[in-house]
């Protein structure tokens, strides 16, 4: 049987490496939550129209499509989906969609996979875990020190 080569830019850990990643993730989650940041998880796909709004990153977006999609389907750009390349666009959408259910200032942390269609190299991957915390509210400067507290 031919030996399979790993897919470049998409790391997979052996169990010991996955245990290390899980441990680091737990420490981050506990630290964020200790400082009052609520955990959220957003979907992996977003409308291409939203992902490419700024324009400069559109070459890095992985488009999601069905294998047996109708070739005559004339879906518009707004109907196409892509994997998110960072957590900013999904978080902004999440806040807008759930604004009536969130308490502001809303303090969130998020740790999940993101995908970028860039050339993999040392320390740069096509799939990786991103972590972040944010505070959304009327007075962003008032909570500025809170956003940095988990980093200390």
What are these regions (language model features)?
Residues 1-152:
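TRNA-recognition modules of translation machinery and tRNA-sensing kinases, especially anticodon-binding
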């Amino acid at each position: 049987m031919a030996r399979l080569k790993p897919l470049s830019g998409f790391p997979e850990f052996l169990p010991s490496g996955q245990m290390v990643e899980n441990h680091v993730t737990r420490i981050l989650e506990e630290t964020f939550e200790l400082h009052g940041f609520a955990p959220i998880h957003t979907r992996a796909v977003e409308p291409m129209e939203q992902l490419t709004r700024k324009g400069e990153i559109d070459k890095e977006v992985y488009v999601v499509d069905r294998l047996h999609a109708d070739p005559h389907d004339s879906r518009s750009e707004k109907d196409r989906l892509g994997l998110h390349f960072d957590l900013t666009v999904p978080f902004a959408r999440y806040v807008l969609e759930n604004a009536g259910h969130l308490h502001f200032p809303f303090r969130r942390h998020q740790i999940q996979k993101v995908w970028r269609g860039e050339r993999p190299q040392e320390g740069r991957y096509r799939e990786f875990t991103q972590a972040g915390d944010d505070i959304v509210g009327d007075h962003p400067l008032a909570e500025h020190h809170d956003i940095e507290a988990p980093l200390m």
